[in-house]
Amino acid sequence: MFNEICIYEAKIEKQEEIEQLMREVAEFYLTQPGVIEVKYIKRTHRQKDFNSVKAGEPPLRLTRQVEKVTYVLYLVVENEEAHARLAKPGLEMFYKRWTRCLTTMPKIILGENIV
């Protein structure tokens, strides 16, 4: 398995647009050969502090967004070749729409499974 984790910081006023775009991208990805799983996650909670984690307290729901909204892509494909085949058409189809919604370029982590 080969994984991509991508962290996006979106403009607050573009939340609806980027979430619709994520649904379209996920739908496209799932039709492509070698794609196993696609998930987009919106950051909605945070930990109070480390002591609250040790005490087993639940995370706190975010009540407001300041300047940006954080999203994460979790993508699993069969191998590096499947990822390469997916990246090119994905960028060609969606890149301009992504850039309109983001405050900065995404942080991308690529790698293989350990467990």
What are these regions (language model features)?
Residues 3-9, 72-74:
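Active-site-flanking beta-strand signature of metal-NTP-handling nucleotidyl enzymes
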Residues 1-2, 65-68:
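Short, flexible turn/loop "capping" segments at secondary-structure junctions
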Residues 22, 86-87, 95-98:
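Short, flexible helix/strand-to-coil boundary loops that buttress conserved ligand/catalytic motifs
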Residues 16-19, 78-89:
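Short amphipathic alpha-helices within nucleic acid-binding modules
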Residues 36-66, 93-115:
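Glycine-rich beta-strand-turn "strand-cap" elements at beta-sheet edges
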Residues 22-25, 29:
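Hydrophobic alpha-helical core bundles mediating ligand binding, dimerization, or RNAP-core interactions
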Residues 31-34:
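Glycine-centered tight turns that cap/initiate beta-strands
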